[in-house]
Amino acid sequence: MMDLLEAKFKVSYPEFNLDVELNLPARGVTVVFGPSGSGKTTLLRCLSGLEKAPSGYMKIADQVWQDEETFIPIQERKIGLVFQESRLFPHLSIQDNLLYGYQRTQPAERNLQLDEVAQVLNLEALLKRRPEKLSGGERQRVAIGRALLTSPKLLLMDEPLASLDMQIKAEIIPFIKRIESEFKTPIVYVTHSMNELLQLVDTMVILKSGKVENIGSVEEVFSDVRSRESIGDEQLGAVLETSVSEHDEEFGLTRLDFMGQVLHVPRQNIPVGQSLRVHIHSRDVSLSTAPPAGTTSVLNILRAKVKKVGVLDPKEYSVDIELDAGRPILATITRKSLANLNLQPGQPIYVHIKAIKMMHELEGL
């Protein structure tokens, strides 16, 4: 049975109310996304125990951290915290900064060691230096390492890359992605950056005005029209997890496999076998009720079925689609196209994908 992070908080302020209920997998990276003032940081403070919600419940795996009778303070919660600023101790070496939390963790509870954390975060050559000798990105990697060396059950990250430029963000994101895969430490990551979100997210929570607007896997949320206002029209469509299976040098293409289906994209400088997340915009999806009768320039045509049709505005419609691989994708079509196709739930269709965006090609990353 999968461990879950369960949380329910109600907090009232003169001009803002937080009212959320979450049931999240205690694995992978959960990204809390929303505009400024949506309640992201307040939620993180409640999860960490920095703030006690008057009406609150929190449980991770089999441990209750807050209910009507219980409130475990932050220092007893086995939580790692990483903020926008690295907050390193200037008088200590990088090694001593890293060991600060480790030395305050009971020996029996130390699941991670300095050498393995330093290796994963590429800090080995920095251990004897002082913080002032490090770049902003290096300092933030040290802050992440210090949090990990407390052997936390949960790592909370509050916009940790917000103060860094795009180049440094691009350097740090791969390290964050490795944390969960290497150490199996679940992460709750707060951001309002779409670039960071698309690089990192496994499970997504959209907050708006203190409430959960949408929650689910990245595939579910990006193919759901309910996310339209929060993530923007330009993001709706599909996010697919694929793996590189072959490079076609003659035609300059890379073959991507996912769940028994295939996509072809321009040649990528990525090794065969490596995973690659791709984004498909709903307006780059066209539909047909029959396979192409002749040769077509569209390389990516997938079989699927219609789940439902919705109205976006008087001239545009959304079509929720399930690919044969079981993955959701959203298409945006005109009213005229809908009339021509006469789409019905359950109807087999063919999805023509005109453009695919690779996540490592996102602007600035």
Tell where the protein language model's regions lie, with residue ranges.
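Internal alpha/beta loop-helix hairpins
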Residues: 181, 191-261
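ABC ATPase NBD coupling module
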Residues: 64-80, 104
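A short, proline-enriched helix->beta-strand linker immediately N-terminal to the Walker B motif
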Residues: 149-153
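Glycine/charge-rich catalytic "coupling/switch" loops of P-loop NTPases
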Residues: 262-310, 335-365
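Catalytic Walker B motif of ABC-type/P-loop ATPase nucleotide-binding domains
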Residues: 155-159
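Conserved ABC ATPase signature
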Residues: 130-134, 138-140
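Conserved ABC ATPase "signature" region
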Residues: 63-68, 109-126, 177-178
